[in-house]
Amino acid sequence: MIKFSATLLATLIAASVNAATVDLRIMETTDLHSNMMDFDYYKDTATEKFGLVRTASLIHAARNEVKNSVLVDNGDLIQGSPLGDYMAAKGLKDGDVHPVYKALNTLDYAVGNLGNHEFNYGLDYLHNALAGAKFPYVNANIIDVKTQKPLFTPYLIKETSVIDKDGNPQTLKIGYIGFVPPQIMIWDKANLSGKVTVNDITETARKYVPEMREKGADIVVVIAHSGLSADPYHSMAENSVYYLSEVPGVDAIMFGHAHAVFPGKDFADIKGADIAKGTLNGIPAVMPGMWGDHLGVVDLVLNNDSGKWQVTQAKAEARPIYDAAAKKSLAAEDSKLVGILKADHDATREFVSKPIGKSADNMYSYLALVQDDPTVQVVNNAQKAYVEHFIQGDPDLAKLPVLSAAAPFKVGGRKNDPASFVEVEKGQLTFRNAADLYLYPNTLVVVKASGKEVKEWLECSAGQFNQIDIHSNKPQSLINWDGFRTYNFDVIDGVNYQIDVSQPARYDGECQMVNPQAERIKNLTFNGKPVDPNATFLVATNNYRAYGGKFAGTGDSHIAFASPDENRAVLAAWIGAESKRAGEIHPAADNNWRLAPIHSDTALDIRFETSPGDKAAAFIKAKGQYPMKKVAVDDIGFAIYQVDLSK
């Protein structure tokens, strides 16, 4: 007993002598989407609102504030802007370094994680791109089909030299682990099927985090390309961060994917979220928006009084590069990065400036959420023409009527960017304009759907709208921004229909039925006659929608054929062909859908948000199908319009 006490005392004395406190800052970029420059290639103009060359200034400043810091990237890096398109079209030869890594390699990243869009161009292209990174990558939940082992390094434990508060050198063993949404197997099935599988994020964390601790990790940093949702836990969830915060042994969560900002007011209602501290169930967590518009910062205080390092204090914040309220830049350009990127930037501008045709009219998406719209119409026209030509030699498919589904991709972001609208001017069109009209490198896929499934597909799309109370004279918001993503608001061309927003939504934002008795889709017709529920249609869409199985009429069993061509390339080719045939395209909407008139004895005050600009105001005045009046500008900068749906 005396021997034991002496040993214990010696241990305590040693721990006391070696006790130290370390401040550690962890910084994060995420969802850069190849926006390296502070430049909007779609508008061919500089911007202060996004771009890594400005985020870099925040990185330098944040580093200079502290003794100890590390920087991580959370994926969706190589795709998403014309720079990414240019590089994918050009290809990567042995030894080529992708421009995103020319930039990131100068900023001393400790580690990177993969996002879902890393797989858009296939595994070979991804591996060639990653070869240019001078920092390691982690991902724990992608499994190689052949080896049944992780395709990438699941986690890393990096010995990191730090300085404690007394000025003494210390060594921290920082563990990093990365995750990607399992849905990549749906979204990029053509690139991944038969090559990899993907495991559940939370279950994978529960497997590896204890192992990381056993192998000596002093702290564990989770880098999750996944969003935050308080929905009940279910396996293979896309947005798993809430449940990652409950995994024992996790010290910090750097997350993304949702293009939102945490800590932020949009997440104030989530149980366990402390917006002031930037914690989730007590764990510091940060999600720094998109395109480099924020830098994520987690600050930890670590102490080893007990003989092992423990987090004693923690906080997180997302630092913006632009003050939207004051309309003021908060970050200057990093001139070194600008110089490094100049050649690729210039080549990208040249790439997107190649003429493809002409347009007889302007194409703006200011009203795309409230009425049929030219920016969606031209996509549907192109997809429909492509499929009708493609099936001519197939006797089984050629007899089926062709519809086309497309959604507005640029209608204010996630109600976080009043400048994010399609603005294509009449006259000469370039590839830049095609990329503005169709943002993503999706491929065209055709599904077979019954008339009943077409209606249910549209019922899910109609979840884009809030229900209007016909007895209330208070202001009512028309657009369901919080519960529905605008890229899921499919307009199906080839049929005619109305959407009755006085009725409750039949489906939620995930196309799960919530009101079985509700019906918003009215007067659904094909060639002037009610759609036969048992009729079969071909519906042109994209690989995300077709393989997703979320909407009625989609999923593997419904695939009629998968095109090798990108929807955007189909659009560009159609613009070229139509311009050659007719001299120019005529992008007017055919008005195959509209919001059904609402009859009420109450003077309704229905409102929607759109661009605040004079160009938008003029367009709305000239093209609005319903009486509309601008009544305010909200705190984000969106114009608020009152719309009369009584007619």
Swiss-Prot record:
UniProt record, GO biological process: nucleotide catabolic process
Cleavable signal peptide: 1-19
Cellular localization per UniProt: Periplasm
UniProt entry keywords in alphabetical sequence: Hydrolase, Metal-binding, Multifunctional enzyme, Nucleotide-binding, Periplasm, Signal
EC number: 3.1.3.6, 3.1.4.16
Binding site for a divalent metal cation 2: D76, N116, H225, H257
Pfam families (UniProt xref): 5_nucleotid_C (PF02872), Metallophos (PF00149)
Family stated for the protein in its record: Belongs to the 5'-nucleotidase family.
PANTHER family membership: 2',3'-CYCLIC-NUCLEOTIDE 2'-PHOSPHODIESTERASE_3'-NUCLEOTIDASE, 5'-NUCLEOTIDASE-RELATED
Function description: This bifunctional enzyme catalyzes two consecutive reactions during ribonucleic acid degradation. Converts a 2',3'-cyclic nucleotide to a 3'-nucleotide and then the 3'-nucleotide to the corresponding nucleoside and phosphate.
Protein name according to UniProt: 2',3'-cyclic-nucleotide 2'-phosphodiesterase/3'-nucleotidase
Lineage: Bacteria, Pseudomonadati, Pseudomonadota, Gammaproteobacteria, Enterobacterales
